């Protein structure tokens, strides 16, 4: 059976991919409609690519490229409504999708600094677990300690000083980078120009 194969660049990584099949596409649509996309998306990335150790935003970008190549919808047709009421046909090149630039993930708690990593795709379904699993190292008193070297009591002491407001701030920091696509639009009626931005996997799925 013929397989359409292609490469996708995600940051510094070159990922080998194959287009997903009609059966896999229909499974994705069904999962989207019944709210169970996590299992299917992870399966598509596993079965259709050789990607390893991607974070959330990298996996989202890979999925969008996989979708665009597989369905032949590199140029997706959509419409945008101008403030003057005009419906404007809009051509969206999904391969122009980008991800926000990564940042150094440091968070300060009193005299302690915590180094985080970005979460994996769908880790954000449980925020508390996501935050705990993304801790890499603790910096205190001039020492840098990998989280796996902390004993149970030390971990409990660390978790006990993380307040509700800290949880919100850390969550926002970890989930800030996402996929986005800016589409320049000019209204043929009123002449107004606008950059329509599609942001986050949820908004991209609305194009399906």
Swiss-Prot record:
Signal peptide: none annotated. Residues 1-5 form a propeptide. GO terms for cellular component: virion component. Pfam families: T4_baseplate (PF12322). It comes from the Viruses. Keywords: Late protein, Viral release from host cell, Viral tail assembly, Virion. It is found in: Virion. One of its GO terms (biological process) is viral tail assembly. Its main location: virion. Baseplate hub assembly chaperone involved in the tail assembly. This is Baseplate hub assembly protein gp26. It comes from Enterobacteria phage T4. The gene is 26.
